[in-house]
Amino acid sequence: MRNLAIIFAASVSLIFICSLRGSAQEQESSETEMKKKLEFSKNILDGLVTEDFSKILKNAEALNKLGRTKWLENESAAYRTQNQVFWFTTGTLALAAKEKNIDGATLSYTQMTHSCVNCHKLLRQL
């Protein structure tokens, strides 16, 4: 009976430790993805100031794809809304780049940045 209790306690401890490790790995993955998003955003800004539409397009499409990844397990309606705004603005940014519309691309970039700031404000509240 005592051996059974020890095995049970060890199993529970192992499950707990594995769940903590999973959370740390998820956080690390999330941080890596956010760094990629920031790098793509910086590249877009560089493309805007140099009117390099291929650079804007490439990075806007990469951001749009990356933005479709699931970031939270329990997505609130507010979070989903922020994600949709992000997808929309990265999409309009890519379209403006295809059309070589610097003013449209600049506006979309500004809207995208606003969406990023709002989403991070929301995440800090969760």
Stretch-by-stretch model annotation:
Residues 1-12:
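Bacterial N-terminal signal peptides that target proteins for export
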Residues 112-124:
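The canonical Cys-X-X-Cys-His
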Residues 14-22:
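C-terminal segment of classical bacterial N-terminal signal peptides
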Residues 22-113:
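Extracytoplasmic c-type cytochrome modules immediately beyond a signal peptide or single-pass transmembrane anchor
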